[in-house]
Amino acid sequence: MKYKTVKSIPLFLLGSIVFTACSTPQSTFHLPVQTTVSAIKKDISGKTATAVKAASSSSSTTTSNDDNNQKGYFLETNRSTGTYDPNNSTRLIKLGESGDFHAADQNKPEEALFERLYGGIASLLNFRIIKPALTYWNTVTPSLKAIGKSSNLITFSQDIDETELQRALANNLIVADDGNNNFWFGLKSLSFNSAKLTDNAQTQMAQKTTQAVTLKSQAQMSSTNTKNTNKKIDLRDKITLSSTMNTQGSGDNKNPSSGLIQKLVSVENIEAEFSFVKTGFNGNEIKFGDFVTENSPTTTQLKQVWKKKWGTELKKTNYKLQLNNFSLLLTYTPEVNKVEKGNNGDSNKGTIATPNGFSFLYPANLNETPSSSSSYWTNVTDLTKAATDTENTNLLNDLQKSQEQVNQFVAAITQNHLDVSEAALTKKQFGSLSISDFFKAIFKENGKDTKAKS
């Protein structure tokens, strides 16, 4: 697949589309992540595993060895066909092993972490970017090429029909009638290769309750004594989160102290695919059928609906996008899943903590002082919750007033080598600094400004 780069689409458009279209009565419905990838199931020889981008080797460890391409985990999220159960929506498979997808084992830190990484990215795309993006796009700048000015943030396939994609994105629910002959346009699959996690000292927040976390993996063992401000973690390898904590009690009764742990994660090599889905309604619930492909039974109907709405022939039923890197703030509190016995029977030799949430690193606000969307532009945003209509309306107002600041912020946070200094995090919750100072303070690498990188 060949790609061409479209410059300067802000982070708010790095994905598409949650069902919450303002024109529909179901605008507050929380969609499950629309990720289904069926091609991976199992290939004993490993020959097709190299094509699985979600678990392929990272850019720094690319190898032609098929065995290496079978390491790690791949996650798919089930598509809803009725009532969505958020506690039973993901399935996991370990590459190189036989068998079907299985639920992630929360007692295995590497599975739990991978699931949360994947789920956090997908939640970010669906719940905290897409709906504001649509509103912003349609109201302020209704053109792909006109949005932003600062960086190459997204890459489309060369055969993209820009007008067609714009219509699909801006009218993500194509309503043919009041029955079951409607089509939804949204995220079909999402894959990524690896993630960078910064050193402990750089991601400790100013709060006294923040605790240092040591992340160990096979990829790091050989360089534990080497200072590296952006250690690269290969998600094919096991990642263990071990937390050094204050404890109370004795023996097996020792418990980790409470506290918030945060790590900045820069996700790399992202590919997203968007497609149409046949939809219908069951009372107030949305039911999803199969994704439309070039030769699926519903393709003809989709093309008829499209032509009736716009008077043009629908050329494509799916679009693949390559996204530049973006960053998540991994947030979790200590949860002991396993206690390893020490040589002297000390039960507190090691405790394993798994993350329990994702947040995205935003500046406190766009204009130094609290604004209408202050609840949205908080330092730590809960991505497990969908933005409300009020939040999105307020956000739009701020975006209209501060478009250039938004563009600068978006360009900066998507750099490949994001480095947040400890001093920058300690000084503020970004409240007293200007946007310019904010960028100068945190987007530096070894004392050099990285803001202009592309």
Curated annotation (Swiss-Prot):
Keywords assigned by UniProt, alphabetized: Cell membrane, Lipoprotein, Membrane, Palmitate, Signal
Region (Disordered): 55-87
Membrane topology reported for the UniProt record: Lipid-anchor
Range of residues in the leader sequence: 1-21
Polar residues bias (residue ranges): 65-87
Keyword Cell membrane: yes
Cellular localization per UniProt: Cell membrane
Gene Ontology cellular-component terms listed: plasma membrane
Sites of N-palmitoyl cysteine lipidation: 22
Protein name listed in UniProt: Uncharacterized lipoprotein MG095 homolog
Domain of life: Bacteria
Low complexity: compositionally biased ranges: 55-64
Lipid-attached positions, S-diacylglycerol cysteine: 22
Major place of residence: membrane
